Amino acid sequence: MRKPLFYATITKTFEHKKGGKDVYLSSEYLKQFDKDLYYKILLLESFEDQAWHTAAQLAQVVQLDARSVSKYLNELSKNYQQFSGKTHPLFTKNHRSGYNFYDTLDSIEHERFLIYLVQSTLKFQLLHDIFFEEFHTMYQFAQKHYISESTAHRKINEWKQQLQTYGIRLQRGTYIAQGEEEIIRLYLHMTFWQLFRGKIWPFETISQMDVKNMAEHIMAFFNVRLNEIKKRRLEY
């Protein structure tokens, strides 16, 4: 009997540690996914020491100019207010000391905020709508996300180049994903795992309970027991 496509990968998991503790989502995973999200999470990682940082200091760390750093910090504060419903910003600013967290985020809130940031990106919305067949026209997508059609075109063209390296194409006009089914499934598996690592179930049209039961049957068939992280990856 042929083994499932992902059987060879279920014994490995992505691990990232910073300062001796596990970090759910590293900016390293995001270099090829979304530039703005990459810099935002890189900046969030910079505040894990709970210290004050000036825009100039942060600019050296993330290799941006100070103005861009300030822009991303302001955007993060707005993102946090939208995510949490709170009125205070994510960061507090001191003329001399620079920036620091207004309130320390607990680990659960931190993870949920990262998930919110990922799901809020145009790249994720594009990936979601195309692979789950909710993308109808460029105009409809642009209207749905309050962007211009030219911005939508630019995002799709950037993504097309990345997909081509996996042998996946987007059909002209309809933007339906084309390629070997196993490759498309593997691409979705890798992408969703790197972005969420089992923290949420991103497959809206698939019953999570059915997949859990299927994973149990697979483990029983191969007579293996996996820890929760590896089991979640198998389910993905």
What is the role of each PLM region?
Residues 8-13:
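Ala/Thr-enriched low-complexity intrinsically disordered regions
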Residues 6, 18, 22-236:
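A cross-family "folded-core" feature that marks the main globular domain of proteins
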